[in-house]
Design a protein with these regions (language model features):
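A short coil-to-beta-strand element that immediately follows conserved catalytic motifs
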Residues: 68-76
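Short loop segments at secondary-structure junctions
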Residues: 23-25, 32, 97-102, 119-121
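Short Pro/Gly-enriched beta-strand edge/turn motifs at strand-loop
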Residues: 1-4, 75-77
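Conserved N-terminal beta-strand and adjoining loop/helix that marks the start
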Residues: 3-26, 93-95
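NUDIX/MutT-family hydrolases
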Residues: 93-95, 104-128
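Conserved Nudix-box catalytic region and its N-terminal flanking loop in Nudix hydrolases
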Residues: 25-63
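A generic structural micro-feature
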Residues: 8-12, 39, 84-90, 108-111
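Active-site-adjacent beta-strand/loop module that shapes the phosphate/pyrophosphate-binding cleft
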Residues: 78-103
Length: 128
């Protein structure tokens, strides 16, 4: 039997996030699953094999929020390492101000809440 190899645990995983801005506010989702359970974060997730990071950011954000995402630009990268839990992720972060629709909680098995927040008054706990 071949052992299961998991990205982010057995080797560094590649993730993406999309900072969605509208009217001076940032859209955040509250996660239900480890390693960020209970934390607020921008929409995002794993990059699928043979998928570009930009396409993954758009896909994950549309899946998690129900929004239609327009123009997306690269913003920065982040790295999460938790030795105790054996988690290691490198994430590419993108930004957009180009969306249509209103956000809805489309993945209640992964997210417990979604909302717009003033960048000077973000909810806690928040994930980097």
């Amino acid at each position: 039997m071949t052992p299961t190899i998991k990205p982010g645990q057995d080797f560094p995983g590649v993730g993406v996030g999309l900072a969605i801005l509208r009217d001076g506010r940032l859209l955040l989702c509250r996660r239900l699953k480890a390693p960020e359970a209970g934390y607020w974060n921008i929409p995002g997730g794993k990059v699928d094999h043979l998928e570009s990071s930009l396409a993954a950011a758009r896909r994950e954000a549309e899946e998690e929020t129900g929004l239609t995402i327009g123009k997306v630009e690269f913003l920065c990268h982040s790295e999460y390492i938790n030795v105790a839990d054996r988690h290691h992720w490198v994430s590419l972060i993108f930004v957009t101000r180009d969306t249509q629709g209103e956000p809805v909680l489309t993945e209640p098995d992964k997210l417990s809440d979604i909302g717009w927040f003033d960048p000077d008054n973000l909810p806690e706990p928040i994930s980097a």
